């Protein structure tokens, strides 16, 4: 039976008594009406015990903080990115060192992007249910079925950790995992908004450079507003409205309001702020990369790079897309230098194969 922890001192006492070398971690949170996730439950495995920790209790997150940052305790988590953001918001810290079982499974050749249930079945043979996936985790008390579902989310992490550690050790890939886990942590730790968000929108490639800069202004403003007001980005300004305003900039505020009339979700109450954002140049916008459709030549180079990466992945027993995504390769073509996002171990296993192809395309 899992232990329901409602006093910070109880959490501290249990962890001090156990002094574990590893803890299994998961969270339940809600993010339907906010920009930032709201922590609703923390599940923690310690040895044979499972603690279900109520973060709504005053002082609980402060008690958690000490153990999340203990460098002598490995934090075993599955697909941790959203949980990391949640811990950062609630506790102000990130759990380190991190062993992400989803990343580890991919690096070990077990499978790419594996869900927790599938990985549990693969390693332990246990079939988990999905009964409480859409549950209300903020309500109290939690139901017995919620408690059992939550406990299952960490119950099998150590068995998976042991098996994947064994495989990665045999394959000499534990260093790969450490690098990827630290990159994930750094991404969350230093997230202050995407610098060039317009490049990620498919519609941007059809806009003229001046329109792309206007789109960049709107998206940067939207992200700042979403963070400050703790509301989803789409509630501030959705992509369709932003793209239309960038493509067809209104001549004045009245014209802006007329354009808003065409879109039910347009933020009429924020019209003045939208107008200012649209018409206020950013200090760095002249340096912004432009989204553009690939040329025939670049398409051919991209195809050769993708084929080479796929072959290398097959040789290493890695799932497709793990070594380098399409976007990584597009960045490589644009920059003509190794993308920082691909890191060191990928460079070691890929650079000798892909860089000659890139150099040949320039000849």
From Swiss-Prot:
Transmembrane segments: none annotated. One of its GO terms (cellular component) is cytoplasm. The keyword Cytoplasm applies. The keyword Chloroplast does not apply. Residues 208-288 form the HRDC domain. SMART domains: 35EXOc (SM00474). Its EC number is 3.1.13.5. Its cofactor is a divalent metal cation. GO terms for molecular function: 3'-5' exonuclease activity; nucleic acid binding; nucleotide binding; ribonuclease D activity. InterPro entries: 3'-5'_exonuclease_dom, HRDC-like_sf, HRDC_dom, HRDC_dom_sf, RNase_D, RNase_D-like, RNaseH-like_sf, RNaseH_sf. GO terms for biological process: tRNA 3'-end processing. Exonuclease involved in the 3' processing of various precursor tRNAs. Initiates hydrolysis at the 3'-terminus of an RNA molecule and releases 5'-mononucleotides. HAMAP family: RNase_D (MF_01899). Belongs to the RNase D family. This is Ribonuclease D. The gene is rnd.
């Amino acid at each position: 039976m899992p232990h329901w922890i409602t006093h910070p001192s109880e959490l501290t006492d249990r962890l001090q008594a156990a002094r574990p070398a590893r803890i299994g971690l998961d969270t339940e949170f809600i993010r339907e009406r906010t920009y930032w996730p709201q922590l609703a439950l923390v599940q923690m495995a310690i040895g044979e015990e499972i603690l279900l920790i109520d973060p709504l209790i005053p002082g609980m997150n402060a008690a958690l903080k000490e153990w999340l940052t203990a460098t002598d305790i490995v934090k075993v988590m599955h697909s941790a990115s959203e949980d990391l953001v949640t811990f950062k918001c609630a506790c102000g810290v990130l759990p380190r060192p991190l062993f992400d079982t989803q990343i580890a499974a991919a690096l070990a050749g077990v499978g790419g992007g594996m869900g927790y249930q599938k990985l549990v079945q693969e390693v332990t043979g246990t079939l988990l249910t999905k009964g409480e996936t859409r549950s209300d985790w903020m309500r109290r008390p939690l139901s017995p079925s919620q408690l059992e579902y939550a406990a299952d989310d960490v119950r099998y992490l150590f068995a998976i950790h042991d098996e994947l550690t064994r495989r990665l050790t045999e394959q000499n890939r534990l260093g790969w995992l450490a690098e990827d886990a630290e990159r994930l942590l750094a991404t969350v730790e230093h997230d202050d908004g995407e610098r060039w968000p317009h490049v990620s929108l498919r519609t941007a490639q059809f806009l003229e450079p001046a329109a792309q800069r206007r789109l960049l202004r709107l998206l940067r403003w939207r992200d700042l507003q979403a963070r400050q007001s703790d509301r989803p980005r789409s509630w501030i300004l959705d992509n369709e409205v932003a793209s239309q305003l960038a493509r067809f900039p209104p001549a004045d505020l009245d014209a802006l309001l007329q354009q808003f009339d065409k879109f039910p979700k347009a933020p009429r109450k924020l019209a003045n702020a939208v107008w200012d954002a649209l018409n206020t140049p950013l200090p760095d916008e002249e340096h912004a990369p432009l989204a553009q459709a690939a040329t025939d030549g670049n398409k051919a180079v991209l195809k050769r790079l993708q084929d080479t990466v796929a072959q290398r992945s097959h040789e290493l027993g890695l799932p497709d897309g793990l070594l380098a995504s399409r976007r990584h390769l597009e960045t490589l073509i644009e920059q003509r230098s190794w993308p920082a996002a691909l890191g060191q171990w990928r460079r070691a296993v890929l650079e000798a194969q892909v860089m000659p192809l890139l150099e040949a395309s320039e000849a």
